[in-house]
Amino acid sequence: MTPVSTSARARLAPAVRAVLVLLVLSVSINYIDRGNLSIAAPLLKEELHISPAQLGILLSSFFWTYSFSQLLSGWLVDRFDANWVMAAGFFLWSAATGLTGLVQGFGVLIALRLLLGFGESVAYPCYSKILAAHFLEHQRGLANALIDAGTKCGPALGTLAGGLLMARFGWRVFFVVLGLGSLLWLPFWIKWMPRAAARTKTEGAEAPPMREILRRRASWATFAGHFCGNYFWYFLLTWLPFYLVRERHFSMEAMASLGSAAYVATALATTVAGWMCDRSIAAGATANIRKRCTAWGLGLATIILGVTAVEDRTASMVLLLAACLAYGVFASSHWAITQTLAGPLAAGKWTGAQNFVANLSGVVAPALTGWIVSATGHFFWAFAVSSGVALTGSMVYLFGLGTVEPEKWG
């Protein structure tokens, strides 16, 4: 597909919807695969004799390659057909997932997590390039929200199915089945992928160099704010199952249900908030409404501290769900903001740079949490740090990001 008029976009709506469905499915699989190790952690830790500190390093190792490959991925998306870049990355991360079920040692497990991170690094630059080129401003909120909902539905399904599957067959079967099953997505993508969408350019214009993007105040605001939001999310994604089982003493089955509920709550909030922003913009509001969503959503997510501060398990889980709802409001808009600011010309590079910075939190959050839990023997200060980082991100979006409007390049 190539950029077309508004009326033509309407005629292409079924094809665009098919692409969006496949993108949502891909990101769901993406997040199942990156979060599956945390689901298996209580069982894997015992079988492979891994300490809490080692587990923190293991959980963060995915982000070493995922984060540092973002700049390369952004360049690849602008240089080559992102559809095939996406297909290659998807194959790599699915293979890494399946092979994880065969490992016998700590070192090989880290190597496969590094391969998983490298494969998954292409996803978001591809998403942003396609959405910036083929969705109007008042359509991007819901499109991004549905993709973000996939990041929550994936872990929800993975936590529920994975917990039940591992309780019956063990953790190795879970990884092998997941890796092989994921590959079923590839034939559908090859058939329906938007042809040459990733190399869309405005006629007569050149993509700005990275140094030009880095000169813009808005880029650094989105980098920092997204880092803070990701810290909160990766803290939950990597440590919530372990926390529920070891500190709150839930069974594996109960952990699976509660973890899934938290992810579903976030997905629902994301979808509703994205749809409401689109409706408001279609009715005449500016894209600044997305900035308010990110700021207030992340600010309200600080109630996560109450999860570990209260003794009653029911009250604790209610606070967890409330924090996830608030985070969902944040998650509905942060990528739509980037796509508006960058436009089709800079979407690949800006997204790659932003995702690089944001996902450094995936290196920091699991490892720092593991160190805090090892040092203190409980999770209170780990939750406190996550809450403080979320509040910082809220302030960055509210006061550090200016007007949300397309940057002028060239």
Locations of regions flagged by a protein language model:
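Juxtamembrane intracellular "pre-TM" segments in multi-pass secondary transporters
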Residues: 5-12, 195-223, 247
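Residue-level signature of mid-helix packing/kink "hotspots" within the transmembrane helices
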Residues: 35, 63-71, 121, 155-156, ...
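Extracytoplasmic gate region of multi-pass secondary transporters
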Residues: 37-38, 217-271, 331, 335
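Helix-breaking motifs and short loop linkers at transmembrane-helix boundaries and internal kinks
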Residues: 49, 81, 102-108, 119, ...
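Conserved MFS/SLC helix-loop-helix module at the cytosolic interface between two early adjacent transmembrane helices
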Residues: 68-104
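Structural signature of the two symmetry-related core transmembrane helices
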Residues: 84-98, 288-305
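Cytoplasmic helix-loop-helix junction between adjacent transmembrane helices
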Residues: 112-153
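Helix-loop-helix hairpin linking two adjacent transmembrane segments in secondary transporters
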Residues: 147-191
